[in-house]
Amino acid sequence: MDPCQCSKSGTCNCGGSCTCTNCSCKSCKKSCCPCCPSGCTKCASGCVCKGKTCDTSCCQ
């Protein structure tokens, strides 16, 4: 299952055309969708967002 397709209050699509609009997903596959704030380093094996600010607690 693709963790990027988890639209809670928006649309997340990690298919051929990757889009992420108003998405409340908790995780995303690599850097496919901008679930983490802009400028926040994505984790190599995926990204788990823990907040809306870019700091050490953004991704784990």
Curated annotation (Swiss-Prot):
Sites where the protein binds a divalent metal cation 5: 33, 35-36, 49
Species of provenance: Trematomus bernacchii (Emerald rockcod)
Source organism superkingdom: Eukaryota
Designated name of the protein: Metallothionein A
Region of interest: Beta: 1-28
One of the record's GO molecular function terms: metal ion binding
InterPro entries: Metalthion_dom_sf (IPR017854), Metalthion_dom_sf_vert (IPR023587), Metalthion_vert (IPR000006), Metalthion_vert_metal_BS (IPR018064)
Region (Alpha): 29-60
Residue sites binding a divalent metal cation 7 per the record: 49, 54, 58-59
Residues engaged in binding a divalent metal cation 6: 36, 40, 43, 59
UniProt keyword Chaperone, yes or no: no
